[in-house]
Amino acid sequence: MFSSLYPLVRAQLFRMDAEDAHHLTLRILGAAGRTGLAGALAPRVPDAPRTVMGLTFRNPVGLAAGLDKDGACIDGLAALGFGFIEVGTVTPRAQPGNPRPRMFRLPQANAVINRMGFNNAGVDQFVKNVQAARYRGILGLNIGKNADTPIERAAEDYLYCLDRVYPFASYVTVNISSPNTKNLRQLQGAGELDALLAALKDKQQRLADMHGKLVPLALKIAPDLDDEQIKSIADTLLRHRFEGVIATNTTLSRTAVAGMQYGDEAGGLSGKPVFDASNAVIRKLRAEVGETVPIIGVGGIFSGEDARAKMAAGASLVQLYTGFIYRGPALVAECVQALR
C-alpha cells in the first residue's frame, strides 16, 4: 500500500528543505515503528537468506548508515523489509556537524550531496536507542571520530566507540571515508590504516573474551581511490584478518553533475553518479582479496538490475540509501526479488 503512495509522499517531501524532510521522515518512521504501522503498510519482502561474516542475513539487501545516525528509528526501518539495518555514524561525544544548509537534492541526476559532518547525539545516547529497539535482526553499528579529535588521535575515538557499541552490534563498521570530517580520509593511507586496524583487532579480541562473542568488523572505504590505494587497503585488510569491507562511501567527483543546480556544493555526492565508480572499486577489491573478505556493495542502486550488477562486480551483500530516498520501500522488495 505504502509503495503505491510513496510517489505522492515523495512529492511533498521534495518540496521541503532536504534536511527538514529527512528529519520529518525519521519522526514518521519512529512513530510507525512504535505503533507497528510500518509493517502494515510496507510491501511484503520474501526471504532470501545469506550467510556472510559468520552472520545469517534474512535477505542480502540492507540499509546503509547515514539515514538514522542516532539509531532512533530502527524498528520502523526494519519493518520495511531490509535484510539488515546499519545505523550511525556515531562519535564518542555529541556534535552538531557542519553548518546548514548541508544537504542538497539533485533530482535530475538521482543524486544527493551532503556535508553533514557526523552530526549525532553521541555514543551514550546511541547505545540507549539501540537497546530500546525491539528489532532482533542483523544490526550494524557504524562508528567514527569527533571533528575536534586530532587525526593523530583518531584511533582513541574508534576504540572508545567500539568498546561502547560492541555488546549490542551484529557487526561494527569503521567509517574512515566520509569526506565531511577534515583529514578523515588520511586514515586510508597505508601506515595510518595499518596502525588503526591493528589497534581495532586487538580491542576486538579483548572484547570477544569479555563478552563471549566475536563481533565482526567491517571497514567503509571511499570510491575515490586509485588501483595502488585499493591494493594497499586490500593487503591491510587481509593482514589483519578484517571480517568485511563496505564499498563505497560518497564521492568528491562532480563530473556527472557539472552545471546542475547544487552541483558545485561541497560534500559527498551519493546516488546514481557513484554507481560505476563504486562497482569499479568492488571489482578491484574482489580481485585483490579473493573470497577471503566479504564485500558489502553500496552506491547508486536504484533498481533490481542495479543490485544484480553490484553483486556481479563482487559484492556479497548490498545496501541502499539514496535510491531508497528516491524510490521508497518498493526498491527493497524489487532488489530482494532480483537477488533470489
UniProtKB/Swiss-Prot annotation:
Catalytic activity field? (S)-dihydroorotate + a quinone = orotate + a quinol
Which residues are annotated as active site? 178
Query: Which pathway does it serve?
Result: Pyrimidine metabolism; UMP biosynthesis via de novo pathway; orotate from (S)-dihydroorotate (quinone route): step 1/1
At the top level of its lineage, which domain of life is listed? Bacteria
Per UniProt, substrate binds at 69, 114-118, 175, 180, 249-250
EC code:
1.3.5.2
**One cellular component (GO) term of this entry:** cytoplasm
Q: Name one GO molecular function term.
A: dihydroorotate dehydrogenase (quinone) activity
* Statement: the UniProt record of this protein carries the keyword DNA repair: no
Q: What is this protein for, i.e. what is its function? A: Catalyzes the conversion of dihydroorotate to orotate with quinone as electron acceptor.
The text of the family note is:
Belongs to the dihydroorotate dehydrogenase family. Type 2 subfamily.
Q: What's the name of the protein?
A: Dihydroorotate dehydrogenase (quinone)
The gene that this protein is the product of is pyrD
